[in-house]
Design a protein with these regions (language model features):
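Short, Lys/Arg-enriched N-terminal segment that forms or immediately precedes the first helix
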Residues: 1-5, 89
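S-adenosyl-L-methionine
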Residues: 6, 10, 25
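The short coil/loop that forms the "turn" connecting the two helices of the helix-turn-helix
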Residues: 10-11, 42
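Alpha-helical structural segments
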Residues: 14-21, 25, 39, 49, ...
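Helical hydrophobic small-molecule/effector-binding pocket
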Residues: 85-109, 114-122
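Hydrophobic/aromatic-rich alpha-helical bundle segments in the mid-to-C-terminal region
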Residues: 118-129, 135-196
Length: 196
């Protein structure tokens, strides 16, 4: 009996998810198509044949992650009569779930730090603008609500990517005080886990 061949879209997704893990761990410069191929369990030639270059693979992996983030926000089960506080809490809880996926979190952080990169700057800016527009147009936040939500998210990203709690625990707790008691601690624990 012949082995069933995986459809092309599933193979592409397998490689994109592997690329997200590798780029999240080591960044664009240190990642190689070979390391991504090993992570995906395919040959380097297969990755190159599918994506042509590491640059294209990074662009597609970044777009994949941003689209996942935007989809989660756009599909949030927010009632039409929910208060601003209820909406922020629901979206904040959703973002906290996203942050638990360390690879997705680090890919977003790395992408949003590349605004001045000559290759990826436009992708970085477009991706951030896409998230903002989803919050405004799909979620229904006004400009002030979207700014507050994004500022809290970016503070979380910064504190977590700096691992600020390792040397400045009181400061990290103060900065993330808007999360509420115990939630910052839970975030630290997730990022203290092996492989994070």
């Amino acid at each position: 009996m012949a082995a069933t061949r995986m459809p092309a879209n599933e193979r592409k997704l397998l490689m994109l998810e592997a690329a997200v893990r590798v780029f999240a761990r080591v960044g664009y410069a240190a990642a190689t198509t070979d390391s991504i191929a090993r992570e995906a369990g395919v040959s380097q030639a297969y990755v190159v044949r599918f994506f042509r270059s590491k640059e294209t693979l990074f662009e597609e992996a970044a777009t994949y992650v941003v689209e996942q983030l935007c989809r989660r926000f756009a599909e949030a089960p927010i009632a039409a009569d929910s208060t601003d506080a209820e909406r922020r809490k629901l979206l904040g809880d959703m973002y906290a779930e996203i942050v638990k996926d360390h690879d997705m979190f680090m890919m977003i952080v790395r992408l949003f730090m590349m605004g001045s990169d000559p290759r990826f700057g436009q992708l970085s800016r477009d991706s951030f603008a896409r998230v903002y527009r989803v919050l405004r147009e799909d979620v229904g936040m006004d400009a002030q609500q979207a700014r507050l939500f994004l500022s809290h998210g970016l503070l979380m990203n910064l504190v977590l990517s700096l691992r600020l709690w390792e040397g400045e625990r009181d400061l990290a707790d103060e900065i993330l005080g808007f999360l509420g008691k115990g939630r910052a601690e839970a975030m630290y624990s997730l990022h203290d886990a092996p492989g994070s």
